[in-house]
Amino acid sequence: MAATAREDGASGQERGQRGCEHYDRGCLLKAPCCDKLYTCRLCHDNNEDHQLDRFKVKEVQCINCEKIQHAQQTCEECSTLFGEYYCDICHLFDKDKKQYHCENCGICRIGPKEDFFHCLKCNLCLAMNLQGRHKCIENVSRQNCPICLEDIHTSRVVAHVLPCGHLLHRTCYEEMLKEGYRCPLCMHSALDMTRYWRQLDDEVAQTPMPSEYQNMTVDILCNDCNGRSTVQFHILGMKCKICESYNTAQAGGRRISLDQQ
């Protein structure tokens, strides 16, 4: 249920109607940029040609008694609870989802807080099981998702960390896997492909090349380890000699061994 904008005193969201499709809350935000009332900044941004700065919100309106007051967790007039969770920095009101405000991220995150740590180099809160087990890329969270080109850092969609360190929205990652397996930025495998590589080993072994190709070699570059090697050409794939990945690309022309020329 999406909220609609209204000017002060104008008809709009019904009295007592709680929250919107984005948040469960008992108040409307008074946008400091245009003085209109919206349930949340996302509803505002979807309807206006400018963005609401969450940090500049000063006033809210209670959905029950309609009193406009300074931003706080409980209505000073009728004691309506505006949100089980309230951040007086982001002015975020919502039901309790174990949220916490991360000073380094500068915004609120869904917790529990003890399940996450802030990586200073990546500049993002990550799950504890990734601590010391992910590849850091400086300020990677400030880059847009390479699939949808939308913001990742402030997105309400969970970010997925690829083995290469790049980030995608979780939903974009799941869609990407329907079409391919490689990071759209660096071409590194986006998940553990070991089982598939072993299947490909069997297929290559069972598919001999025609005699004129059996002694043909090619230089390859591995997208997974960045190593270079010279291997036998095969139409099904060419396996990196260093890491045994088939995520490779030709780095030079094909050639026939001298003893076969």
From Swiss-Prot:
TM ranges: none
Species of origin: Homo sapiens
Residues bound to Zn(2+) 3: 62, 65, 75, 78
Sorted UniProt keywords: Cytoplasm, Metal-binding, Nucleus, Phosphoprotein, Transferase, Ubl conjugation, Ubl conjugation pathway, Zinc, Zinc-finger
Query: What is the uppermost EC class here?
Result: transferase
Q: How is it modified after translation?
A: Subject to ubiquitination and proteasomal degradation. Interaction with PLAGL2 or KAT5 enhances protein stability.
Compartment list: Nucleus; Nucleus speckle; Cytoplasm
Q: Where does Zn(2+) 1 bind?
A: 20, 22, 40, 43
A single GO molecular function, which one?
A: ubiquitin-protein transferase activity
Q: What is this protein's function? A: E3 ubiquitin-protein ligase that mediates ubiquitination of target proteins, including p53/TP53, TP73, HDAC1 and CDKN1B. Mediates ubiquitination and degradation of p53/TP53; preferentially acts on tetrameric p53/TP53. Catalyzes monoubiquitinates the translesion DNA polymerase POLH. Involved in the ribosome-associated quality control (RQC) pathway, which mediates the extraction of incompletely synthesized nascent chains from stalled ribosomes: RCHY1 acts downstream of NEMF and recognizes CAT tails associated with stalled nascent chains, leading to their ubiquitination and degradation.
Any matching Pfam family: zf-CHY
Q: Which domain of life is it from?
A: Eukaryota
What pathway does the annotation place this protein in?
Protein modification; protein ubiquitination
What is its induction?
A: Up-regulated during the S phase of the cell cycle. Expressed at low levels during G phase.
Q: Which residues bind Zn(2+) 2?
A: 33-34, 44, 50
Q: Which residues carry this modification: Phosphoserine?
A: 257
GO CC annotation: what is one?
nuclear speck
- For the ligand (Zn(2+) 5), the binding residues are 102, 105, 118, 125
ZnF (CTCHY-type) intervals = 82-144
Q: Which reaction does it catalyse?
A: S-ubiquitinyl-[E2 ubiquitin-conjugating enzyme]-L-cysteine + [acceptor protein]-L-lysine = [E2 ubiquitin-conjugating enzyme]-L-cysteine + N(6)-ubiquitinyl-[acceptor protein]-L-lysine
- Keyword Phosphoprotein in record: yes
Protein name as annotated? RING finger and CHY zinc finger domain-containing protein 1
